[in-house]
Amino acid sequence: MLKVWIVGSEGQIGEAINEVLDPLEIEVLNTDKNALDITETDEVLHFGEINRPDVIINCTGITDTDECEKNPEHAYRVNALGARNLSIVARKLRGKDRPAFHR
């Protein structure tokens, strides 16, 4: 069975993807900011190694420009380092031939 990891599953895009995948025979792993801190490389690697997803869909991000300007370091950590950490997991677990999606 295909295993899909939706990172940021509680957001608008994550919830929409869950609705699409729900009727399919796919195991969905949902994480949000309360369950997993994507800015922490070791935490992301640990989750990936334990669960070994076939596909990673990154629905995380701080899109509010005012928020990004108020706290640029946090915005950078989530938007850049978080995406980097997920790509490290994808590469480490599956190599270049396995998909990872970033919204």
Which ranges hold each PLM region?
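SDR active-site strand-loop-helix element
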Residues: V7, T31, C59-T60, D97-R103
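Adenosine-cofactor binding site in Rossmann-like domains, unifying the SAM/SAH pocket
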Residues: D22-H46
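N-terminal Rossmann NAD(P)H-binding glycine-rich loop of SDR-like oxidoreductase domains
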Residues: L2-P23
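Residues at the starts of beta-strands that form the adenosine-phosphate
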Residues: K3, E27, K96
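NAD(P)-cofactor binding segment of oxidoreductase domains
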Residues: K70-R98
